[in-house]
Amino acid sequence: MAKRDYYEVLGVAKNASDDEIKKAYRKLAMKHHPDRNPGNKDAEGHFKEVKEAYEMLSDSQKRAAYDQYGHAGVDPNMGGAGAQGFGGFADAFGDIFGDIFGQAAGGAARGGGRAGPQVYRGADLRYSMEITLEQAAHGYDTQIRVPSWVSCEICHGSGAKPGTKPETCPTCSGSGSVRMSQGFFSIQQTCPKCHGTGTYIPEPCGHCHGAGKVKETKTLEVKIPAGIDDGMRIRSAGNGEPGINGGPSGDLYVEIHIKQHSVFERDGDDLHCQMPIPFTTAALGGEIEVPTLAGRASFTVPEGTQSGKTFRLRGKGIKGLRSSIAGDLYVHVQVETPVKLTEPQRDLLKQFEKALVEGGSRHSPQSKSWFDRVKSFFD
């Protein structure tokens, strides 16, 4: 089944700004999040589709590649394999992207026809990490175990058996590319024997089987900064896959996903919560306590408060990564109707209702206004 256009998935224009793309992603991710749609396979599929679209369009290089070549330009299945459970950023258009960006992701740095082994930068890796809202707000240090490729200790990354060394490729004479002519046309292609490295290995290393790298699990320290938001990435330089022929290692990108909170809903640096209050407090007013990420806070509910009223507590939200002050906490009160009343309680409420009726409409102005608008339906 053909993939949908990434801009169509997020519902944005092709010239949408980074902020518009991020806003659209947040809205759709919240709508289709599996925690909000348990057991809903359609929602799960939409969530994955939205996440994939945002990963591509939020990265300037991948967005440029997608704009020019479509899905083929960013399809990881057409490039080198990354570590298990990770998304590699390499692609099958190294020569084309090398001209556009100077160096292909996970590919070789081109040298303007210069002979010699091609130097390859290691592929970038991606690691998804779930954290709580409290951890996102306050920040913390943690460790992650990352399955990755590392340079082989036996051959020191050369891929050759100890005591031997890679030799210059006889097909391309070490340039990593060959030129094929057909009629008036001449095309330069990656060497089929050495695959662009400029060398080949007569006697491969028995430990890594000539790859020059082996898979192992690394433990890395990760510092989660206070105020980080859902979908943001932390870059760990040099902790991606190792380079080839002395090339630099790629980077590791830790993508943050914040778990749904039982009380709060985040909107940027602001927090929202729904809070039930007794109908007596709503009618008479009073002081109530609310939870915040920093502890308890209190505010006064004025008498006559209606259900759905929103109260703003300044500075009780989250201090974002780029903010000098914290956001606000919005408390949406819901007036709770008492249930399972005893007979004495029922009698008291009936007496109260009678007193309200005798007092006229001044006690229930909204009811009077509503009945005035609909009385024609009952005539």
From Swiss-Prot:
SUPFAM superfamilies according to UniProt: Chaperone J-domain (SSF46565), DnaJ/Hsp40 cysteine-rich domain (SSF57938), HSP40/DnaJ peptide-binding domain (SSF49493)
Compartments where found: Cytoplasm
CXXCXGXG motif repeat residue intervals: 152-159, 169-176, 191-198, 205-212
Gene3D superfamilies: DnaJ domain, Heat shock protein DnaJ, cysteine-rich domain, Urease metallochaperone UreE, N-terminal domain
Zinc finger (CR-type): 139-217
Listed PROSITE patterns: DNAJ_1, DNAJ_2, ZF_CR
Residues given in the record as Zn(2+) 2 binding sites: 169, 172, 191, 194
Residues where Zn(2+) 1 binds: 152, 155, 205, 208
Sections of the chain in a coiled coil: none
Pfam families, per database record: DnaJ, DnaJ_C, DnaJ_CXXCXGXG
GO CC list: cytoplasm
Keyword Metal-binding among record annotations: yes
GO MF term (any one): heat shock protein binding
HAMAP family recorded: DnaJ
Family classification: Belongs to the DnaJ family.
Function: Participates actively in the response to hyperosmotic and heat shock by preventing the aggregation of stress-denatured proteins and by disaggregating proteins, also in an autonomous, DnaK-independent fashion. Unfolded proteins bind initially to DnaJ; upon interaction with the DnaJ-bound protein, DnaK hydrolyzes its bound ATP, resulting in the formation of a stable complex. GrpE releases ADP from DnaK; ATP binding to DnaK triggers the release of the substrate protein, thus completing the reaction cycle.
Comment, domains: The J domain is necessary and sufficient to stimulate DnaK ATPase activity. Zinc center 1 plays an important role in the autonomous, DnaK-independent chaperone activity of DnaJ. Zinc center 2 is essential for interaction with DnaK and for DnaJ activity.
Name used for this protein in its record: Chaperone protein DnaJ
Name of encoding gene: dnaJ
